[in-house]
Regions:
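Conserved catalytic cores of very large enzyme subunits
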Residues: 2-290
Length: 290
């Protein structure tokens, strides 16, 4: 029998391995919590298990692991730009040096981190980091030459700048939707964020890349719009759960400040895209999925 929360559509030996220990995991996790409650709140310790059994309270991922893990994590991608994932996986020799290696290493990073938590891994700087490598390959103001050919005369497949960016999108999306052995054959839960101009200025106005350059709003805006449009079209053809998207906007009490992004948000919902919207009166907070 498969756990209703297991996110699997068919049984195989990989997800069976994950399911078979869930009863034991649940007993261990529940006893750990009861032991702690007996120390902190002995008067309610006995009630804890009764309330769980009667679905009055809920404990997240109680059966997924016998050890205590945090639920979700949001991570900065800056160490990825400067060090790569070698300090985690012990294999990758250096930081990413082009668009393709960045797409590979960010996928590896998400898999590595997801094995150390029960929930999601949020990479809110995905488009900021991606732009760093787009600029490295295609130069400043790459967004003005999206339809320029960017492959050598010796290449049989001719690709434009736009094609290469879409290729990076595909590598990232196909990667994070792959089943993971360490997650009982589930994909690693992955979150990304889109920012309106107000959010971008507040969060990244003073941000510098490792080479001292700064991200341009027009470049980030172009990447975000390209990804949203492309991802929505791909989802019409196949089920792709990840990344889960959050669209962040700032309001002034009367309306969204960045009216262009208010319009984009409405357009994407009208086109059937599925994403979360987070609206705040200040860019000092951020939501990813939850």
């Amino acid at each position: 029998e498969t756990d209703g929360n297991a996110n699997v559509t068919m049984k195989n030996v990989a997800n069976l391995e994950g399911e078979v220990y869930k009863t034991t995991n649940r007993i261990i996790q529940r006893q750990r919590m009861k032991d702690e409650l007996n120390i902190l709140f002995p008067e309610v310790a006995k009630q804890y298990e009764t309330d769980l059994d009667n679905h009055i309270i809920y404990t997240h991922d109680e059966a997924s692991t016998p050890v205590l893990k945090q639920y979700c994590m949001a991570v900065s991608l800056y160490p990825l730009l400067t060090e790569g994932v070698g300090n985690i996986d012990g294999v990758t020799p250096s930081e990413p040096n082009d668009l393709q290696s960045f797409s590979g290493q960010i996928t590896n990073l998400i898999f590595l981190l997801s094995s150390q938590c029960k929930g999601a891994v949020a990479v809110g700087e995905y488009f900021i980091a991606l732009n760093y490598y787009v600029v490295k390959e295609f130069g400043d103001k790459w967004y003005e030459k999206l339809d320029c050919e960017a492959s050598s005369p010796h290449c049989l497949i001719k690709r434009t700048v736009r094609d290469n960016i879409l290729k990076a999108f595909k590598q990232f999306v196909w990667g994070v939707n792959q089943p993971a052995g360490n997650r009982s054959y589930q994909s690693p839960f992955t979150n990304i964020s889109y920012y309106d101009h107000t959010y971008f200025t507040s969060l990244f106005g003073e941000f510098c890349y490792p080479d001292g350059s700064k991200p341009e709003w027009i470049a980030i805006d172009t990447l975000q719009r390209m990804f949203m449009k492309w991802f929505n079209q791909i989802r019409l053809k196949q089920v792709l759960t990840f990344p889960v998207e959050t669209f962040a906007m700032v309001h002034n009490g009367d309306d969204i400040i960045d009216l262009n992004y208010k319009q984009l948000c409405a357009e994407m919902y009208a086109e059937g895209h599925s994403f979360f919207t987070y609206i705040s009166d200040s860019a000092d907070s951020l939501a990813s999925c939850c």
